[in-house]
Amino acid sequence: MYNPPPGGGGGNNGGDQSQQQPTNNATLFLLQMIQQSQHQQQHQNQQQQQLELQIRDQERILIEQQRMQHQQQQNQLLQGLNQFPFNPLGLFQVQAAVQAAQAQFAQNAQGSPIPFHIGSPLQPSHSPAASALQQQYLLPSHSPAITPFARNSEAARNIEQFIAQEEAANVPRANSQQQSPLIRPIPQQQALNIQNLTSTQQAQQILAHHRQVPVQQVQHQQHIPTPPLALPIAQQGPISNEVPSVPPVVPATSAGCPQREPRQQQGGRRQNRPGRRKKPEGPPRVDEALAYLRVIKSTFSSDVPVYHRFLEIMKDFRAQRIETPDVIEQVAELLYDSPELVLGFNTFLPTGYRITLTPDRKYVFSSPQMQPRVLLSPDERRARAIEAGAQAVGAIELGSQEGISKDEDRTIEDEDMDKSKEKDDVDGIDDEDDEESGIEDKNNEEMMEEDNHLIEEIICDDRKKDDCEDSQQEIEMSSELAAHTLNIIELLKKSFLARPTKLVDFMTFIDFFMSDQQYKKDMEKLRKDDEDDEIEENEKIEVDDVPGPSNAPQEIKKPDDIEKKDSSKNLQIEESCSDYLVSMLANCCIGEPDLLAATIDFLPYLGKLLVNGSDAIALKIKTILHFSATNDRNDIPPVNRVNPSDVDMDLVKQMEKCKMGTKKNEKLKLKVAGQGDEGATVELMILKKSYRILYERLKSRTTPNQLSHLMVLINAYANLDITREQLISELPKIMGTSGSDLEMIILQLLGAEKEPKNRPENDMDAVMRKDLPAIQPKRGLRDQKMLQQVKNVEAATVCTLGPSYRFMKDTKATDCSGRVELDDDLKGVLNDTWTSIPSWSSEDTGSQAIKKSNLEEFHFKTEDERYELDIIVDSNRTVIEQLSKTLRDYEAMSDEDKKSFKLDKWLNASSRSTTIRVLAKVFTNSAQDFIDAAQKNPLVGLRRILESLKEKDLLWSRFQQDTNRTWRDALDKQMSAATTILNNQHKNYDQKAFKSKPLVNQIEQICEERRKNNSTDTSPHLILEYTPERKVYRDVNDVTGHFFHDLSGTKCDRDRTKIVLFSYRILMEWLCQEGQQVQIDLDNGEIFKFQGDLNEDENLMTLLNMDGRRICGDRVVPVSTSLESNESSIDHFSENLHQKRTRRTFYGDDSVYMIIRYHHMIQERFAKILSTQAIYAQEHFDNQKKNKRWEDGIGADMHGRKALQENIKQRRAAVNDIRNVRSCPSSSYETTLRELKQLGNAQMDIVAFEEAVKNLFPGDIVLFNNIDKLFSSLAKNIHHATCAEERENPIKLYLKYRQRIMNAERDEDMESVIQEYGQTAEEVLRGKNTYRFEFVEEQNKPFIKIWVIPREEKDDDDDDDEEGNEGGKDEDNVKDEDDGGDGEGRDGPDDDQPPPSNDDGDDEEDEDDEEDGPSGADEPESTSGSGNVPMDHLNIGENFLWSPPEEKVCTGKMTTNEKEQRNSVDYMKVTTTPRLRIHKRMLKEHKGCNVELMTGFQQLSAIVPLM
C-alpha cells in the first residue's frame, strides 16, 4: 500500500472542488468550537448577568468622567509642548496623532460585525516610549504621549496659530473621511533635526527637567503590547539622509488572508473604573467566534458551500497545513463581496496583521514581515491565471523555433527585466540601474553558458506547457463538476438522512478518490521528468565526444530487473487502489442506486476508471447496478438475469443486512426507462429493505411545511446542535398534536420508548440499530473531547486490520531509526503501513460499572489504606534487616578490610528503590546527606541511620495497631448495617416464598405448560434434593414438636400426639429414614408402642381415629439396640421395612405437598447451619495451631533476625486483636436448637432469638429470618393432614397399603401394589390436586421426585351413591365410629371444634351454621328416606354413647372374634345429610328429651364422619 498525499486535488481546481466536499469536516470543526466554548460561555454569562445590574447605573457617569479626563490630558499635552525646541512639523504630528485616536473608535466599530466596546486609549507604563521623550513625537495614535505641564500659555498660542496656518493651506486633518497614517514620512532636514535632538547633552537636560516637574501619568492594570512600528529611537537604526518614499501598493498574485490589528487600534479600551479590577487582554472569546460564524452562515444561507469552505480553511489552519498569510488570502477571496465580514475578520488576527479597505473598494493586507499589498478579487485572480497560461504558451512557441535571433533574446531579456522591475516595485526598492549595469558587465566568455541556459529554459517551457494543459483540463473538469454539485448534494441529504454515519464513509471515499487521482498525477509527472532527464543525458553524451578525464559525478543507473520490479509494483498498487476504490464506493452507496449513478457522473475520472479499468471492476459496478434477486423472481426472463457466479455475493449480503423497511420480506424495486426504442423499463436494483421507505413514511404523514421543519430539526440533532430531549419536545410543536403516528415513529428511532417491546432493536420494522444515530447521553467536556477524537480517527480510517490496527489516510510513515538493510523476506514481516490505535471498546461511555454498596466501598478504601501502611512498615523493616547485616559484617572486618570497604549510593542494599524510598520517607530532604556521611564513615553513619529507622519502626507499629482497631470497629459497623439491610430484603422474600399459593402455582404451571405443548415427557415436575446427614431429620422433628401449642383449632394434647406420631413414624418412613420409637399412654393404662411390629399399621389407624381425650401422654424413645422383642414376625417385618428404605412411593393432596415443601426448606437451612459450624470449627482449630506456633517463638524472628521482646509482645497482641480468636464453635448448632425450642414454646421473642443467633452465626443470620413462621406453617399443615376426619385422608389411605408395600418381595409385586394404590388415591382425592411422591436415596444423595395430577370434579353419579347409601357407611366409617365413640361425654362442647384447615384456621362449617340457623328452625320434617333418624335406634345409640368405664377397650392386639363382635354392632343408620342440619332437626323433633340425650346427639355428630 502507499500513503496518499494530503489534500483532495491539485492545481487550480481546489476552489471549485471544495464545493463538492461534504460538510462533515466543517461540522466537526464547528462542533469542537462549540464544545470548547460551552462551559466558558455559561460561566461568563452568569458573571455578566450578576454584574450587569450593578454596573449599569454607574457606567454612564464613569464614561463622562473618562471623557473629561481624556480631554484634560490632551490639553496638558499641548500645553507642555512649548518646553521643547522643535519645528511646526513635529507639533502637527502630535496634534494629528491625538485627533486620530479620537476618530479611530467609530471607524473600527462600523466595519466589524462583532460588537466592539469603545473605551479610552491607554499607554502602558512599562513601554519604552514612556521613558524616551524623543519617542513621544513618533507614538501611534493609540498610545497617547505623556508630556510635562506647560509653564505658561505661550505654547497654546503657538499651536493655535500653527493650526490656523495649516487649515488655510488645506492640510488634511485626522478627522477627515480618509484616515491619516499613524506615522507620516519625515523630510530629510526635519529628520536630521530630530536626530540632533537625540544628543546626549540635550537628553540629559530634558530628563533632569522632567524629574523636577511633576508629571500626571495614567496608572494601568493590564499589559498592552507595544506595536512593532513604535520602537524606541535607541533601538532604531540611524536615519538615512535620503527621504524615504512611500512604497507603492502592488497587487498580490495570490489570494491572501489578513490578520487583525491590536484592540487599541480598533477603538481603544475603556479606562479603569474606580473600585473595579480590569481583566487582562486576551485572545478573542469563543462567543465572538460563534457570532462571526452565525453572521457568515446567515449571509450565505443560499450559498452553503461558502460557509463550509470557510470552516475548512479554519480547520486547515488549525492542523498547520497553511500559514497565517495564506489564511488571510483565502478568507478575503472567499468573502470578497462582503466587506463587513472581511474587515470583521481583523478581530481574530494576531498583532501587526490587518486588512483595510481603500476608497476604490480594494482590500490592502499589511503585516510586520512584508509591505502592504492589494488582495485580488476572484475575477482578477482568474484573469491573471489565464494570462499567465497564455504567456507560457507564447514562450513555448518561441522556444520551439529553429533559430533564435538576438532581437528575440533581447525581448526575453526585456521581459526578465520588466519582471524583475515589477518585483522591485513590490519590495519598494528601485534596482533598475543595478540590473542594467549587471547586464552590461557580462563577458563574451559566458556565451556558451547562456546558450545552455536557453536550452534549459526551452525544456522548462515544455514542462510549463504540459502543466498548463493539465490546469486547463482541471478547469474544464471543475466546470463540469459545478453543474452536478447541487444534484449530488440533494442526493446526499436524501440518502443519508436516516443514517448520518454513512456520510463519514462517503467523505472518506471522496478523500481517497482525490488522493488517488493526485497520486496518479504525481506519478505521471515523475515519468515525464524521468523521460526528460534521459533526453538530456543522451544529448550530453552526444556533445561530450572528446575523451578526457571527467570530475563530474556519474549517476548509477538501476538495473533493468529492478526497474521492471518497481514498475510492476506500482502497477499492482494502482490496480489494488482501483479495486479498493470501487469497493468503497459500493459500500457507501449501498441501497442507493441513484446516488451511485450520480457519483459516477459527478467524478469524471471514476467513469474513465470504469471504461479503462479491468473487466472485474466494470463487472462489479454493473452487477451492483443491475443485480436482481433471481431466486424468487419468476417475472424476469432468463436472458435478462445476471449469472450469480459473476456477482460479488459478499457485497450483496452486506447490502441486505444494512437495509430497513416496513415489513421483513418487503422488496423495493428501482426501475429506469430503457435505452431501446421499445421503452421497456430496466430494473436497477431489487432490495428487501431501503432507507427510502422511512422518508416516504414521513412524507405521507406530514405537510411540506411540516416536513421541512422536521428535516431541519433532524439535521440539527445529527450535527449535535440539539439534544435528544430537545428534539422530542419540539416534535409536538411541529405536528400540532401530541402522540401522533409520526411522533411515535421518531421516538422508536431515537430509542425513547420505555417498554422493551417497543424498542427499535426488538421491532422488525424499525431501522437497524447500527445505522441509527447514536443516543447521545449527557457528557462532560472530557467525554466530548474523547468522542471527538474517536470521530476524527473513524473519519481518517481507510480500512482496519483487527480491532486496533488501522490504515489512516494523510498519514506518512515515520522512518525507523537504526534500521539496517534487510532481505526482502524480512522486510515483508515489518509493519510500515498500519497504525495502532485503541479501539475504545473497554472505555465505552454508554456502559456503566455496577454501583458498589457502602460496605464494598468501605472495603476497597480500607484495603487501599492498609496496603499502603503495610508497604511502609514492611519496607522499613526490610531496610533495617539489610543495613543491620551490613553493619555486623563491617564490625567483624579487620582494620585493613575496613579501610578498603566502601558503601555505594544505596548503602549496599539489594533493592535500590526500596532503600531510597524509605530513607526519603524518614529523613525527607536530608536523605542524601545521611548517605554521604555513611559513605565517609560507615560505622557511625550506619548506626545513626539504624537508630532512626528503628525509632520509626516502633512509631509506625503502634500507629498500625491503633488503625487496625479503628478499621475493625468501622468494619463491624458497616457489616452490621449491611447485614440489617440484607436481612430485611430476605425477610420480604421469605414472606412471599412461605405462602402456599405460590408454591402450588409453581408446580401447576409446569404441568400446564406440558399439557399445552402436548409433551410426552414423563419426567418429574419437581425434584428436591436432601442432605445425607441423618441427624438433621431428627433435629427438624424435635424442633417442630415445640411449635404446636399455639395452633388455632387444636384440641390440647390429643392432636399433638397424632402430629408427633406422624412426624416421627410416617414422615421419617417416607424419607427413607429410621423412625424413632414413640410410646402412647391411654387413660386406662394401655400403652401403645410403635417400634416397627406387625400391628403398627392397625394401631396407627386406630390412634388417628381415636379421640384425643383418652390419650394421657406420649414419649419419644431413642432408637434402642436392646433385644426385648425378638419375635419372628417383628423381625420379618423390620427386615422388609429396612430393605425397602432406598425407595418410597406415596400419594397425597395439597396438604401433603406443603408438608414436604416446608420440611425441605427447614431441613436445607439446618444442613447449612451444620456445615457452617464445621467450617468455623476447622478455622478455630487452625487459628489455635497458628497461635501456638506464634507463642512458641516461630513467628518472633521477623525477616531472619531476633527482635526485641517488647516488640514481640506488641506484635502478638496486634495479631490476636486482628484475628479475634473466639471460643470453639462446636456447640453452636446445639445452642441454636435450644434457642429454637424456646422460641417455639413462647419462652423467647423473635428479636432476642435473632440477637442470640447473630453471635453464633454472624454470616448466616439470613437463614433464621422468619424461621418461626416457617415452623408454624409446617405444624399447621401436619395438623390438618393428620387430624382431618374426612374420608379423603391421604395418610389413612397410605396406612391401608403400607403393609402390602412392605411385604412385597419382588419388584413386580411392589409395582402392582403401587399402581393399585395410585388408582385408589385418584378416585378418593378426586376434586383435589393429587401428587405422587417418590423418595430415592442413591449414592448418598437423597432426593424426592414430585408429579402433580390436576384436580378433577366429582361426577354426579358418585354424589348420588354417597347420599343414597341405604346400607349406611362402609367398613372404614364403621371403624371410625367405633374408635371415636369410646369414652365420650367428658369434654362436652369442646368436641364441636373442627380441625384446622390450611387457610389460617378459617372454619367454613361455622359460617354454614350461622347461615342455616334461622332457616333450619322452620324447615319441615323430611318423610323421605333421606333425612330421618328412626326413634327405635335411640336407645342403642344412647347405650353406645354412655358405655360404662369398665367396658373393654381396644388393646394393642385384637382377636378375630373381637373384630366380628365389633362389626356386628347395630349402629344408627343416618343419611349423609350435613352433620349440623341433622343435629338441629333432632333437637326440633325431641324438645322434651333430657340433657343427656341432647349431649349424646352432640357427641354423635362429632364422631360419625358425615359429609
Swiss-Prot record:
Loss of function: phenotype: Uncoordinated movement, protruding vulva and ray fusion defects in the male tail. RNAi-mediated knockdown results in sterility. RNAi-mediated knockdown in a him-8 mutant background results in no deposition of dimethylated 'Lys-9' of histone H3 (H3K9me2) on asynapsed chromosome pairs.
Composition skew (Acidic residues), residue ranges: 427-438, 1354-1365, 1373-1382, 1389-1421
Alphabetical GO biological process terms: cell fate specification; defense response to other organism; locomotion; negative regulation of transcription by RNA polymerase II; nematode male tail mating organ morphogenesis; response to endoplasmic reticulum stress; vulval development
Signal peptide: none
Compositionally biased intervals (Basic and acidic residues): 439-450, 555-568
Any one GO MF annotation of this record: transcription corepressor activity
Composition bias, Basic residues: 270-279
Residue segments, region Disordered: 1-26, 228-286, 397-450, 543-569, 1349-1434
Subcellular location: Nucleus
Tissue-level expression: Expressed in all ray structural cells including ray 6, 7, 8 and 9 of the male tail. Also expressed in the inner labial neurons, socket cells, the cephalic neurons in the head and the ventral nerve cord.
Pfam family, one: PAH
Composition skew (Polar residues), residue ranges: 16-26
InterPro entries cross-referenced by the UniProt entry: HDAC_interact_dom (IPR013194), PAH (IPR003822), PAH_sf (IPR036600), Sin3-like (IPR039774), Sin3_C (IPR031693)
Origin superkingdom: Eukaryota
Domain PAH per the UniProt entry, residue ranges: 282-352
Alphabetically ordered keywords of this record: Nucleus, Repressor
GO cellular component terms, semicolon-separated: chromatin; Sin3-type complex
PANTHER family: SIN3A, ISOFORM G, SIN3B-RELATED
Job of this protein: Probable transcriptional repressor required for the deposition of dimethylated 'Lys-9' of histone H3 (H3K9me2) on asynapsed chromosome pairs (both autosomes and sex chromosomes) during meiosis, but this does not seem to solely affect the transcriptional status. Plays a role in ray fusion and patterning in the male tail, and this may be through activity of the histone deacetylase complex (HDAC).
Quaternary data: Component of the SIN3S complex, which contains at least sin-3, hda-1, athp-1 and mrg-1. Interacts with ztf-11; the interaction is weak. Interacts with cfp-1.
Name the UniProt record assigns to this protein: Paired amphipathic helix protein sin-3
